[in-house]
Every structure is written in structure tokens, then in C-alpha cells.
Amino acid sequence: MTLRPSLLPLHLLLLLLLSAAVCRAEAGLETESPVRTLQVETLVEPPEPCAEPAAFGDTLHIHYTGSLVDGRIIDTSLTRDPLVIELGQKQVIPGLEQSLLDMCVGEKRRAIIPSHLAYGKRGFPPSVPADAVVQYDVELIALIRANYWLKLVKGILPLVGMAMVPALLGLIGYHLYRKANRPKVSKKKLKEEKRNKSKKK
């Protein structure tokens, strides 16, 4: 089989692209993460039946160990006090926060978190590379339930603060407008009024 000279560059380009794709696959440099969704596995069941699992607004005390898929540890709280977080306040990566929902005190879970729910394209240099899948082993040590009023205050207080700023600016503007449009009395009239008042006395 002979190739026409005009198709030779096209075949060479196709061969080059194919070999580059094979080399990249063999080197393990795939651009897409092998894990696309959050995977949560219970390692240790809670010691007693759990009446009230963790929910948004609750304060959790957790011990955790975070690692890459290859086993390299990126962070752990086992050598220090438990981490204290409030669910729903985005204090930890999204995948870890999602894995803590409905957890009970004494329960241990393993969460395998895809990069878009972890550190994303930037990573967390130097310990977490870009687009890395991470694994967290988490134990819930204590749970402080948020009461209804506390949730209400935390939900409404920022809105009230945001509404107060325009209201105060409006009041200040109104006061300045009234002050600027008040009829001005000349100094002569003020002196005359003062004299007239003193004469009447």
C-alpha cells in the first residue's frame, strides 16, 4: 500500500497524537479524576441508637485524618484537640462537610472526596496537588445541637445588619437635606431678635 504524498503529513500527525495519548495513559497522567462523586463509608457504627444525627447549624467536635489516595497523610487532628466546626458555615471543604451530615456521636466514617469537592484545580500546595482526590477518616467526638432560637438569630441577624446600613444612610441623608434646606436667617436678624428679647425682659 502506498500513501499519496498529500496524505502523509496527516497520517504522521494522527500517529503522533495517538502515541502521545498512549504515553500519557501509561504514565498515569490522566487529566480526569477517577472519582467523580463523594463516597462515604461507615467504618464504625455509633455505640447506641442515634436519636438526633448531625444537621446544619450543629456544632461538631471531630477527629480526622486526611490523606491522598496513595496514602500520604496531608493533615490530622489526632495529635491535637478535636476540630470544632459548625455545619453549614463552610469551615471545611465541601465534601467533608457533606460527609458529616447525619453522623452520630461515636461513629467513624471514611469519605473519598473528588477534587471538585475538595481542593480543586489549585490544590493546597505543598501537601495537596492540583485535581487530587482526597480521603478523610473522621470520628465524631461530640455534637452540640443548635436550638431553634440560635438558628433563627444566626439566620436573621446578618439580614437585619444588611437592612440597617441603607436605613442609617437614608436617615443621615434626610437630616443633611433638611439642614441644608432650612431657611437661613441673617446675622443681622439674629442680633435684632436677641435685642428685642432682652428689651422685653
UniProtKB/Swiss-Prot annotation:
**An individual GO BP term:** chaperone-mediated protein folding
State what protein this is by name: Peptidyl-prolyl cis-trans isomerase FKBP11
Similarity annotation: Belongs to the FKBP-type PPIase family.
Asked whether the UniProt record includes Hydrolase among its keywords, one would answer no
**Key words of the record:** Isomerase, Membrane, Rotamase, Signal, Transmembrane, Transmembrane helix
- State the GO CC annotations: endoplasmic reticulum; membrane
Question: What's the catalysed reaction?
Answer: [protein]-peptidylproline (omega=180) = [protein]-peptidylproline (omega=0)
> Could you tell me what this protein does?
PPIases accelerate the folding of proteins during protein synthesis.
Q: Which GO terms describe its molecular function?
A: peptidyl-prolyl cis-trans isomerase activity
The membrane spanning regions, by residue number, are 156-176
Question: What EC number(s) are associated with this protein in UniProt?
Answer: 5.2.1.8
Task: Report how it sits in the membrane.
Answer: Single-pass membrane protein
